[in-house]
Swiss-Prot record:
PROSITE patterns: ANK_REP_REGION, ANK_REPEAT, CAP_GLY_1, CAP_GLY_2. Residues 367-377 have a biased composition (Low complexity). Pfam families: Ank_2, CAP_GLY. Residues 16-27 have a biased composition (Acidic residues). Gene3D superfamilies: Ankyrin repeat-containing domain, CAP Gly-rich-like domain. Microtubule association is inhibited by the ANK repeats and the Golgi localization region (GoLD). Palmitoylation by ZDHHC17 regulates association with the plasma membrane. It comes from Mus musculus (Mouse). It is found in: Cell membrane; Cytoplasm; Golgi apparatus, Golgi stack. The N-terminal half is dispensable for proper Golgi targeting, whereas the GoLD region is required. The modification Phosphothreonine is found at T374. This is CAP-Gly domain-containing linker protein 3. A lipid is attached at C534, C535 (S-palmitoyl cysteine). The keyword Membrane applies.
Amino acid sequence: MTKTDPAPMAPPPRGEEEEEEEEDEPVPEAPSPTQERRQKPVVHPSAPAPLPKDYAFTFFDPNDPACQEILFDPKTTIPELFAIVRQWVPQVQHKIDVIGNEILRRGCHVNDRDGLTDMTLLHYACKAGAHGVGDPAAAVRLSQQLLALGADVTLRSRWTNMNALHYAAYFDVPDLVRVLLKGARPRVVNSTCSDFNHGSALHIAASNLCLGAAKCLLEHGANPALRNRKGQVPAEVVPDPMDMSLDKAEAALVAKELRTLLEEAVPLSCTLPKVTLPNYDNVPGNLMLSALGLRLGDRVLLDGQKTGTLRFCGTTEFASGQWVGVELDEPEGKNDGSVGGVRYFICPPKQGLFASVSKVSKAVDAPPSSVTSTPRTPRMDFSRVTGKGRREHKGKKKSPSSPSLGSLQQREGAKAEVGDQVLVAGQKQGIVRFYGKTDFAPGYWYGIELDQPTGKHDGSVFGVRYFTCAPRHGVFAPASRIQRIGGSTDPPGDSVGAKKVHQVTMTQPKRTFTTVRTPKDIASENSISRLLFCCWFPWMLRAEMQS
């Protein structure tokens, strides 16, 4: 296998903010483990990560015996070990201290850089403290060892212009923040990063809702009144809950606490605008609903994607402003009507969702009033809605060439009937054979007989039969995963049962909308993309070279 030289991906030149340092000298190979550590740092050329012969995985696993032989083999070079560290997988990041120690044993200078990402071993250690992928304890052990050997906290990656403290704040690792600031110079805590609008580490923590890192930075003297290039202090870059998507109501609790923490930390001599958006806390919820033509119990559409029943409107403890609580038709929510221990309404688990008032509109396809008059959706009267389905079907027969707008919306809201041809997950075609509740999962499910044997069963799950089809032709999917692509394929005699199931469906099809980017997204897109490049590109490059 020939090694690919990613020369076109060379890091850009240093910015003005980078500390003065001696010129790095590229070296072709790492020194042997017995060689003394060099006096000057160098930039190591990029290399692919070594893997055992006939290895089943595309990433390096330090827990595997074959990989351990490579890791502890003196012939494994420093560039190859840097390539292993670049792999953003838990198996590698949890062993950052072991791999880092092997790099140092081979004579690596404590401030040597990886030629592909321009990151030092201390940068990698701070990144490895990320919760979920990394291990903060292992990252702290390696960082303490590097700092004891004289690692420079002020060095920056030329890709992201971030130093070690910026990485620790970005990945919300307060233990690393304490270690880095313990012996660092005072000006390090307020050092700025050009890719985050020349904001400090406190700005980075605030904009990414890193509450733990923000508290630690304030404890160590971070300036809460320092302004970035846009004239914003850290409290002003905290994401506003009103701009968050529908599934981030819980994150609003963190945003509120973080903004309060930063505002209270600002000296009294510094004046800050306490309100950046209109405050509707004193507006009664019923007046807000009346202005929108809504009332509790109405069928609503959230952000053009999810349908449900309006259960609450008013102020909340987790964020300022007016919020609406909706009981969704499908278990696609985040709660049961309570957030942070405060109950606002009652609904089944995973069917409650909070959203700003601006993201709610009245659903066109409203069900009978009996469905919205009680907190919990009761079982529907099939005999009555079946007749309604027949009337709609007859109306379409009278004028098939020009159906009314109402009938089209009814068909769209119904998704599909038994016997309809559908597309599952945008990939598999089949015919609807079942719709209703199941024993294997809550909510309503479609049972589809696929055209090809790419399914999971023959219409039965865990011994319960819902429909009949050939083996491996059956699959179940929620309404959000199917798309109607044709009419019914069943004989006319089966249409009555189809209408009955047709009217039970109450979900709107999901539509694709262009996400509105907030100023925070636009301001930080360069830094985020570069950071993701440093994490993922080396692994992608390795996979491409193997293929």
